[in-house]
Amino acid sequence: MASLMRKAAVAPAKATRTTVKASASLQRVAQAAGVAVAGFSLALSANAANVKLGADSGALVFEPATVTIKAGDSVTWTNNAGFPHNIVFDEDAVPAGVNADALSHDDYLNAPGESYTAKFDTAGEYGYFCEPHQGAGMVGKVIVQ
């Protein structure tokens, strides 16, 4: 009977050690998850906004027409239809000292899925348009805070 009591006394000690190990493992998993979430947040901020060239309905618009980002972030425009589109920044509608031509993508994005990305370092408002569809109202704005 004494040997049974010793075994019973030893068993809880093993369970306690297992609990400590499980707790340490859970702590490592939580830390790894925190690092993964932080990395994902940084990846999202590096490409802060996405704009469709042409609406799902087929309308000749930038969707959304206005995006707001932080200085240092980027905007990606993706052709959503088979129409040729481009992104032209108006030199009179960008902050002083910003080269509108350097931001613009004059070449046409012809196929669905083709994209262009620009990075914005200077705060202010940036007006742009699609050259072949400006008359149809295909204009947009990037607001950089």
UniProtKB/Swiss-Prot annotation:
Sequence intervals crossing the membrane: none
Plastocyanin-like domain sequence ranges: 49-145
Source organism, top-level taxon: Eukaryota
Entry function: Participates in electron transfer between P700 and the cytochrome b6-f complex in photosystem I.
Cofactor (UniProt): Cu(2+)
Gene3D superfamilies the UniProt entry points to: Cupredoxins - blue copper proteins (2.60.40.420)
Family according to the record: Belongs to the plastocyanin family.
Pfam families to which the protein is assigned, alphabetical: Copper-bind
Compartments where found: Plastid, Chloroplast thylakoid membrane
SUPFAM superfamilies reported in the protein's UniProt record: Cupredoxins (SSF49503)
Residues given in the record as Cu cation binding sites: 85, 130, 133, 138
Transit peptide start and end: 1-48
Membrane-related topology note: Peripheral membrane protein
GO terms for MF: copper ion binding; electron transporter, transferring electrons from cytochrome b6/f complex of photosystem II activity
Protein name in the entry: Plastocyanin, chloroplastic
Keywords: Chloroplast, Copper, Electron transport, Membrane, Metal-binding, Plastid, Thylakoid, Transit peptide, Transport
Record gene name: PETE
